């Protein structure tokens, strides 16, 4: 997202402090992305709908507290959504669910055509689901949500170097356990 697009979103958010109708533009733009982000962590449409509604309700009710930090407004929504999901699982004391799409795993891993097989992808998905939550969160945001490290740091309330380190460690585990080449540039 360009700096100009980020500033435009920030302007809309500023307008929504006085006119809640303006918030609708951001809601329309990001609802589906936030819904999908939450759904991957719940695998339950009704629960996802509730948590997504709560995410946007919290954002709207706290719009006056929003501070611009150079990241897209979407990062703020993702942060609220991540907090809502964490709060839900803490309250329920249940195991977190991660629904990982096979197609996204195929995009993540560079597999030459002669090495590719369905069994490998299924084993990889199973392994990803067993990763510690902090590692899976960064992989999801980085590769499935296409967030840069600055946004990941903001969403997870960690430093940018912490986001890079978690990503590197998670990918290193995958490389070692599956002897795979993983798409990772470490820059963005």
Model-identified regions with their sequence ranges:
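Amphipathic, Lys/Arg- and hydrophobic-enriched alpha-helical face
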Residues: 27-46, 62, 128, 177-180
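N-terminal module of bacterial RNA polymerase sigma factors
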Residues: 1-33, 186-188
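Internal acidic/polar
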Residues: 87, 95-121
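Short amphipathic alpha-helical boundary/capping segments
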Residues: 10-15, 123-131
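Structural recognition of an alpha-helix C-terminal capping motif at a helix-to-coil junction
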Residues: 50-57, 71-83
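Arg/Lys-rich amphipathic alpha helix in sigma70-family domain 2
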Residues: 65-68, 79-99
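DNA-recognition helix of helix-turn-helix
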Residues: 86, 124, 135, 141-144, ...
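Short helix-coil-helix linker/hinge
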Residues: 19, 118, 128-136
């Amino acid at each position: 997202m360009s700096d100009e697009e980020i500033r435009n979103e920030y302007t809309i958010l500023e307008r929504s402090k006085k006119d809640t109708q303006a918030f609708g533009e951001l809601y329309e733009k990001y609802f589906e992305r936030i819904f999908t982000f939450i759904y991957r962590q719940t695998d339950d449409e009704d629960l996802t709908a509730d948590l997504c509604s709560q995410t946007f309700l919290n954002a709207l009710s706290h719009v006056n507290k929003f501070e611009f930090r150079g990241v897209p407004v979407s990062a703020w929504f993702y942060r609220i959504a991540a907090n809502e999901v964490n709060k839900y699982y803490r309250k329920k004391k249940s195991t977190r669910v991660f629904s990982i799409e096979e197609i996204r795993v195929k995009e993540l891993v560079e597999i030459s055509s002669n090495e590719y097989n369905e069994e490998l992808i299924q084993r990889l998905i199973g392994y990803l689901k067993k990763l510690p939550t902090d590692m899976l969160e960064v992989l999801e945001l980085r590769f499935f949500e296409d967030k840069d490290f600055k946004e990941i740091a903001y969403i997870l309330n960690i430093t940018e170097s912490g986001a890079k380190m978690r990503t590197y460690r998670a990918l290193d585990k995958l490389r070692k356990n599956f002897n795979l080449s993983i798409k990772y540039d470490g820059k963005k």
